[in-house]
Design a protein with these regions (language model features):
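Short, solvent-exposed helix-loop connector elements
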Residues: 25-32, 191-200, 230-239, 261-268
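Conserved small/polar residues in nucleotide/adenosyl-binding loops
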Residues: 269-276
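Accessory alpha-helical DNA-binding modules that contact the DNA backbone or grooves
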Residues: 194-249
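A short, charged helix-loop
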Residues: 168-193
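Short, surface-exposed acidic
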Residues: 115-116, 180-185, 234-235, 261-264
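Short conserved micro-motifs on helix faces and helix-strand junctions that flank
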Residues: 10, 143, 189, 199-203
Length: 276
């Protein structure tokens, strides 16, 4: 479906911005009390730079609505599905923790909508807003480099890695995963993700997973036809790890029906939050 709407929603991965700012800059403290503020400063600089650059975009690419989406606690509903989900992650740095609230206040000071919801990840909120926009044929650009969000890319939804000034559309997703966005979930389910402690099928990487999905069409079809796969080792590992693959699919699939209470109603022209 062609994009017939004049609206263009930009969904900013706020948590991604925070950690990029934290690790990219040397420690910085407030002179008056020693409060760590390096991530706050870096986040604000990144957001301001992005807002300024977005003003110079062509009209078709210029955002009409903004929202910054945050994670909340480390644990969420995925830990109920698989208790080891992200269990390998290091604890949040102590000097970063007190900066979270100031970053949220900074977003408010920019008069941009900040959204978070307990028990869900930022990616799920982004997926939900993207789904709502798609139903209204509204163009969406997701400001993030997170590969887990690439399953959302389609004709009206794009990604932008502002740190690398890299545009991510359907072809860029295919270049990375070997499949188009609508099959990314299936590839991730087979390959797993060590950074999130998602098991996948042992010995199956992105390249092999893409070959299998391109051959059979879906994760379920791969598992149904596992016994017919010619390579003995690959055949056996698929037969032995069906449950892991199916659990992995539940983990990598972003929820598109999160009960968000805040509408996307931030005016780009006035940078002012308002209710619709």
């Amino acid at each position: 479906m062609a994009n017939n709407s004049k609206k263009h929603i930009y969904l900013i991965d706020g948590s991604g911005y925070i950690f990029r700012a934290y690790y990219a800059l040397p420690p910085l403290t407030r002179k008056s009390d020693g409060l760590p503020v390096g991530a706050v400063s870096g986040f604000c600089n990144m957001l301001y730079k992005f807002l300024e650059e977005s003003r110079s975009l062509d009209k078709v690419d210029r955002p009409t609505h903004f929202a910054v989406i945050f994670d909340t606690a480390r644990k969420n509903f995925r830990n109920d599905i698989y208790k080891e989900y992200k269990a390998n992650r290091q604890d949040t740095p102590e000097d970063l923790i007190p900066q979270f609230s100031y970053i949220r206040k900074a977003v408010e000071a920019f008069n941009i909508l900040g959204v978070e919801l307990a028990n869900y990840e930022a990616d799920d909120l982004i997926a939900t807003y993207k789904e709502q926009a798609s139903k209204k044929n509204i163009k969406v650009t997701i400001i993030s480099s997170d590969k887990d969000l690439m399953q959302l890319v389609d004709e009206n939804t794009f990604m932008m890695d502002t740190m690398k000034d890299k545009y991510i559309g359907k072809e860029e997703v295919k270049e990375k995963f070997g499949v188009y966005p609508d099959k990314v979930i299936d590839v991730q389910s087979l390959a797993g993700d060590s950074s999130d402690n998602i098991p996948g099928v042992p010995g199956i990487g992105i390249k092999t997973a893409a070959e299998l999905i391109n051959q059979f069409g879906s994760l379920e079809k791969v598992l149904e036809n596992a016994s017919s796969i010619k390579q003995p080792k690959r055949r056996q590992t698929l037969l032995d790890n069906k449950d892991k693959a199916l659990i992995s699919k539940k983990l990598v699939t972003l929820k598109k029906d999160v009960p968000v209470k805040t509408p996307l109603a931030v005016s780009y022209t006035h940078l002012r939050a308002h209710e619709t």
